């Protein structure tokens, strides 16, 4: 039988004896992919350290050995890069895979659902906990609901199927109580028969990791019927997790930048304001940078941009500054021209205009007042154009109106870090009162813990030992 051959190939591709949960997941996949009903989907849930990435990699290699088309996707650039490395096959962001820019609209930000010309392809989406199903206000992409559009795109292709992989204990999308793409009833609501499985057995090699041992303890608090209490983090006997006092942070961060590299070190905070404080302190006291933007600065894009890179640069993408020039003040804002490289896109180089004011504010992007002032100022520059349509088109193509909105990327909120992994991760939870000890906080802490691959540092954190 085809399913028997597929199962054998998956086991061979895995290269080691699977756990009971992994074996069950592979069996479920065989039933899913060989079902005569093509309106089927599969959800594979799994916590950190349970080996779901190994199962996904085995599925990809087995399907490719049978000459079946497999398309890998993830919500963010860094998540796609990690998925690609784990699966040994290229991966795209969901947005880049399913959307195409509208033509002849004069609006550079209009993206419609693309055409899926594939036949009998398997689409696998990692980090699916991040996928929202609520329409976003003023959304530039498709219907505005990423999950709606993803399902529509996949099943518009003849015989195509969707597999969603994620961790239900992680933070759900902003404004959601749980992750819709990992919720069976939500996916069934699209008229799909859903196969589901969960890898819940922590792999033996994970027991020696303080990161995964503590993350597992934190995750299990979500399933415990007892009232929530402060997680009792254990450090003793683990080399990969440690507490850091505030007075030692500068020296420790400097060491991480030297050992792991700036692109593999991150500070995770509870708020944009805390991230801003850390970013300012790191630039001044660790990196010794005085100018607002310098060569070598790591940035994070905070608003989708369609002007400088095809097809677009997404909110959450990271950039490294290679060169800064022509700093200037216009329209009550400050701008600079910069040469950037995008590490999540194989170091692709971009020349762009950046608005500098977002770097030093607590706001997540330009405020409505700043945006309106910028629009009015740029529009006035094109008063010589006789027709309103011409003036609006000129504004939408203007380099200052389309300037990249960025934040420093040394410290970010957990939602911004989600989907990514770093060798060295520093967690600052800030002040935490008894009222703030909620399931949402536990998910935040679990998500932050599981961003680290080598070393985790807890800043001013009360631990068990």
Language model features with spans:
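Conserved adenine-nucleotide phosphate-binding loops and their immediately adjacent elements
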Residues: 2-16, 45
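Conserved helicase motor core of P-loop NTPases
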Residues: 3-6, 25, 29-30, 37, ...
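N-terminal pre-Walker A segment at the start of P-loop NTPase domains
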Residues: 10-28
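Conserved SAM-binding loop
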Residues: 18, 72, 267
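Short, conserved phosphate/pyrophosphate- and ester-handling motifs at nucleotide-, phospho-/glycolipid
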Residues: 22, 76, 271, 419
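ASCE P-loop NTPase helicase motor core
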Residues: 26-27, 31, 36-234
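Short, solvent-exposed amphipathic alpha-helical segments in soluble enzyme
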Residues: 88, 282-285, 442-446
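C-terminal accessory regions
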Residues: 335-465
């Amino acid at each position: 039988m085809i399913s028997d051959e597929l199962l054998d190939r998956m086991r061979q591709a895995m290269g080691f004896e699977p756990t009971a949960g992994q074996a069950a997941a592979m069996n479920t996949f065989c039933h899913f992919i060989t079902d005569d009903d093509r309106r089927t989907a599969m959800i594979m849930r799994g916590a950190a350290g349970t080996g779901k990435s190994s199962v996904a990699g085995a599925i990809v290699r087995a399907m490719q050995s049978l000459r079946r088309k497999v398309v890998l996707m993830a919500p963010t650039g860094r998540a796609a890069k990690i998925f690609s490395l784990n699966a040994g096959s290229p991966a795209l962001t969901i947005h880049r895979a399913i959307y195409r820019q509208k033509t002849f609209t004069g609006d550079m930000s209009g993206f419609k659902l693309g055409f899926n010309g594939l036949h009998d392809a398997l689409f696998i989406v990692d980090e699916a906990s991040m996928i929202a199903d609520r329409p976003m206000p003023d959304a530039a992409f498709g219907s505005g609901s990423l999950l709606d559009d993803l399902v529509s795109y996949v099943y518009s292709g003849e015989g195509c199927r969707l597999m969603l992989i994620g961790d239900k204990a992680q933070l759900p999308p902003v404004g959601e109580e749980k992750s819709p793409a990992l919720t069976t009833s939500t996916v069934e609501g699209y008229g799909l028969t859903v196969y589901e499985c969960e890898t819940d057995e922590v792999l033996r090699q994970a027991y020696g990791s303080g990161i995964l041992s503590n993350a597992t303890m934190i995750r299990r608090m979500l399933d415990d019927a007892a009232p929530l209490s402060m997680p009792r983090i254990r450090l003793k006997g683990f080399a990969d997790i440690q507490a850091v006092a505030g007075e030692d942070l500068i020296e420790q961060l400097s060491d991480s930048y030297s050992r792991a590299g700036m692109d593999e070190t991150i500070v995770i905070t509870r708020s944009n304001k805390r991230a801003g404080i850390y970013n300012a302190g790191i630039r001044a006291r660790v990196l010794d940078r005085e100018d607002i933007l310098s060569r070598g600065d790591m940035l994070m894009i905070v608003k989708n941009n369609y002007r400088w890179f095809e097809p677009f640069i997404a909110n959450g993408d990271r950039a490294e500054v290679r060169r800064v020039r022509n700093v200037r003040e216009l329209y009550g804002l400050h701008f600079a021209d910069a040469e950037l490289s995008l590490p999540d896109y194989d170091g692709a180089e971009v020349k762009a205009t950046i608005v500098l004011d977002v770097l030093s504010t607590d706001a997540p992007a330009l405020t409505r007042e700043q945006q309106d002032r910028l629009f009015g100022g740029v529009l006035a520059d094109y008063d010589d154009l006789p027709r309103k349509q011409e003036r609006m088109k000129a504004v939408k193509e203007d380099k200052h109106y389309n300037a990249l909105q960025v934040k420093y990327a040394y410290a970010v909120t957990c939602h911004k870090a989600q989907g990514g992994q770093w060798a060295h991760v520093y967690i600052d939870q800030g002040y935490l009162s008894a009222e703030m000890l909620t399931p949402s906080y536990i998910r935040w802490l679990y998500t932050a813990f599981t961003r680290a691959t080598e070393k985790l540092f807890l800043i001013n954190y009360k631990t068990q030992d």
